[in-house]
Amino acid sequence: MLEGERSYQRGQENLVPSDNTSSIPESQVIPKSHEMPWYIQHFTKLLIGFGLGGGAAAILLPWFLWLHCGMSSGSSDQLRLYLLYVTGGIIAVLTLLQTNWKNQGDRLKIDADIKKNEQDAEKNERDHIRQVHAERRSRYTRAVEQLADEKATVRLGGIHTLVGLVDEWLADETLDPEEQQKEGQVIINNLCSYIRSPFPLATKIEDLQADTVPASYMGDFISDQAALREEQDVRRAIFDEMSKRSSTFNKDNEINVTPGIWSNFEFNFSRAPIFYTLSNLTIEKANFFYATFYGDARFRWVNFIKNANFFRAKFNRNTHFFRSVFTGEANFAEANFTQNANFGESIFIQNANFDRANFTQNANFGESIFTQNANFGEAIFTQNANFFRSTFNQNGEFLRTIFSHDVNFGEVSFEEKTNFFRAVFTQNASFRKAVFNQNANFNETTFTQNVSFREATFIQGADFCMATFTQKAKFYRTVFTQNVSFRKAVFNQNANFNEATFTQNANFNKTVFGQNGSFDETFFGQNANFRKAVFGQNVSFHKTVFSQNANFYRAFFTQSTSFYQTVFTKNVSFQDVSFACETHFDRAVFLGNANFYKSIFRGNVGFIKATFARKSRFFGAIITGNGDFSKTTFEMYVSFRNATFEGDAEFSGASFMRNADFQDACFTQSHSKFIAMDEDSGKLCRAQFAALPTDWEKHNFTVHEGSQPIPLGTTELDGVRYSIPVGTVLFDPDSWDERQKEYTRLSEPAQ
């Protein structure tokens, strides 16, 4: 006997009345207040007595008074008449009392008859109800027995009988709602118990679904195949009937759920073997805790009403939840997906939990909607994972998640916080055009292969602290609206930030770029911090704009470095920076103070046509290769104090608009060049020094004692003589011609 059947019978011991129940007595006891009064008991005697007595009094009393008291004849006749009236009245009253009592008795008898008839009817109704309930229980018992029948048609008939009995109990108006629910739940438990019952052939479903007999198959293939298909139909029928009676909803604009007649029941499919399709159904309170799915698990277009529990469920073959809707919480924690899992275009109205789930093959969540929190913490995706165009309306949790193969978060919308803390991406990862509307945490995340955030948008903070990028990292045209941190991040291969936008602070403190780092045409809206950053190979900041302070303090550039046409709007610091190879600042624009204090340039460095709008300091800088400052413009004070030029120092065509300080500079190999032939124009290109007011500090060309000297000559402008390098000229800072783009008042070359 099934467990559900035993519980059902135990429940009936308290529901069925015992056979010893006393019946309503047939005779009725007359109340004491309705007993016969004395005047009714002696009615005849009283009637005769009053009649005779009144008649005698009417004859004798007037006669006696006439005879002995001298009453007149007329008065005696009048008295006689009065006595007769009184006697008649008494008799009439007595008769009325008797009639009234009789009427009351008739009414009591009628009421008693009516009450007896009602009691008889109630008894008959109770007997009928007991008979109906007994008949239902008898049908229930037979239906439960049918579930164990060998014939599928008989089992199917038992299922339909049980389903009908549930509906009958719910429609039984003789029971209160609690009793209706209790009776129906007993049958529901039996149906769920049948779903949970083992079916050995389910383990052979892969062989039995083949068109031909597998060579290694043990058993009667044809018979087993037929039995499997029959049982699939039988068990699917249970879900069909449940679906018809479950809640309905529409999702045109918003999810509106309308309860069904079975919506208050509890359904338990835990540890059930599922080996049949469940697509196109409504499943309410789906509890598949520890369930095992043999063959493909098909839940396409299924509406899960209220919570759906697949905790530690095991999916042995492909899993299909395509376009399914989960109106309650969806729990797939620690579920095991052995083959492909497809949740494409699914909708999760409440929290979705895939914590520690294991996806052995491809997992597809493309275009799915997670309305509330989505948790994939510590989940494992062994093959490709696809979240393309999915929407996370609340927090997206990928804490310590492992993506062993390619993963696609392209065009995903993260509306709330996103957490990829210590997540591992073993293969390629794409976040192209993804939108992070709240804080995004990639702290200590590992990207083993290529990763792309191309054209992604981070509306709030982005944290990539101590993240590891083993292969190429692409942030091309990525937009960071708030603060972003790559502090101590490691880029082992190329890092591409070309045309990226950092609206707020960008922190690359102690970041390591193992190979090429590219920031071409990147925009830094606030402070950019590259303190102690390490650039392992070529790095490019072509046409990059730093709107606020830029800090490269003690950064290390291992290979060639280019800041070509870069714009530093505020202060920039390259203090103690080491440039190991060729470096270019050609046409760069420094609108704030530029600090190259004790920087080391171990290869050639070029500042050709660069512009320093404010103070520039090269104090103690070391240039081991050639240093080219030709046609550079120094609009404010420039200091090369204690700087060392081990190669050629080219200043031809440079413009020094304020005092130039070369005190204790050291030119170890050759003289500094302040004039040279311009290859393009064929003209001699001379450095220019502003004619400073007399109260200003003069240009200083007193080099270090062991240095090659700067050959000086003299020239004058406006009657003031200056010592400047031979061949260079003085100019009047106020003589700039905007049309000709040159100073018009120049001195003769210094001699």
How should each PLM-predicted stretch be described?
Residues 37-41, 56-64, 291:
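Feature of secretome-associated and extracellular-like proteins
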